Amino acid sequence: LRSIAQNITFIAVMRAILTMDATGTAAAAHTVSAQMFQLGLIAVLALSTLASILIPQRLNSSMSGPDGGVFEAKKVADRLLVWGFLLGCFLGCLQSCMLPLLPFFTPLQGVQEMARLPVLIGAVQMPLNGLVFVCEGLMQGHQAFLRLAGGMFVSTTFMIGALKLWGNTVEGVWCCFFVFNISRLFFGLKHHLFDGPLAIKTLRAMSQ
């Protein structure tokens, strides 16, 4: 279900991009921006996978052991969120510094100029993506797949609405990803902080 929602989002984005102009410049600029963005996204995805592995590992450890149990899982999860944010900041700075490398991605001057601002917008979003992907990795570790899919469907709905309002330029489409990812982050943090297995109230109840 989560994959279906993601595919709907990508289809909506590509539809907005392809109908933007008849020359194909916008589509080419979006493709170049996405390629540069995905170079950093690989590292963030790796951290998400790590979160999905470490959390069940800690939860399945002995509650009485020094390294196991819910409280240790909470520490690991919080640490991963911090690392996700810091990694996102680093990757965002790195992507911003890669602007002079645009000619290596496309020789067309018009595409290079149109891709500059989307690349910078993507760089600004990297810290947000670091948090989002770690949160979703944590939810996968808790096997909260239905909630993850539900949050993704809601976020996709917001994204489609944002595209109708601001999706008439390449920069506008990339700004719409803020709406998409902030919604995903809301559902991820809600699960982590308020109503998931590692929520603060849950840990307080266990410690009493």
Tell where the protein language model's regions lie, with residue ranges.
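Short alpha-helical transmembrane segments in multi-pass integral membrane proteins
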Residues: I55-Q125, A162-Q208
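Hydrophobic faces of transmembrane alpha-helices in multi-pass small-molecule transporters and flippases
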Residues: L1-A12, L39-A43, L47, V119, ...
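Small-residue-rich hydrophobic transmembrane alpha-helices
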Residues: L18, A27-M98, V132-Q143, R147
